């Protein structure tokens, strides 16, 4: 089972917001997920982004792979940098 951290589309037509979820890679985009770890609303000014950093770090250490878009959001928040530092500090 490959686990991904990805965005689940919510909201109405032409007014999307996204929940950032941990899901099995085989489940549909808006389908079943394991855990919600944040949300992202691109329509507000400034952009509304909330991430549960400790939970995301835990999933990354367990081997979950972020999607490209989620990886960019995590990088902007500095979470990917902390993950890489923690990962290479152990070796």
Curated annotation (Swiss-Prot):
Q: Is Magnesium found in the keyword set? A: no
Which InterPro entries did the record assign?
Ribosomal_bS16, Ribosomal_bS16_dom_sf
SUPFAM superfamilies, per database record:
Ribosomal protein S16
Question: Which Gene Ontology terms describe the biological processes this protein takes part in?
Answer: translation
Q: Which GO terms describe its cellular component?
A: cytoplasm; small ribosomal subunit
Q: Which molecular-function annotations from GO does this UniProt entry contain?
A: structural constituent of ribosome
Q: Which UniProt keywords apply?
A: Ribonucleoprotein, Ribosomal protein
- A Pfam family annotated for this UniProt entry: Ribosomal_S16
Where does the record locate the signal sequence feature? none
Checking NCBIfam families in the record gives: S16
What family does the entry list? Belongs to the bacterial ribosomal protein bS16 family.
Q: Which PANTHER family match?
A: 30S RIBOSOMAL PROTEIN S16, SMALL RIBOSOMAL SUBUNIT PROTEIN BS16M
This protein is called what?
Small ribosomal subunit protein bS16
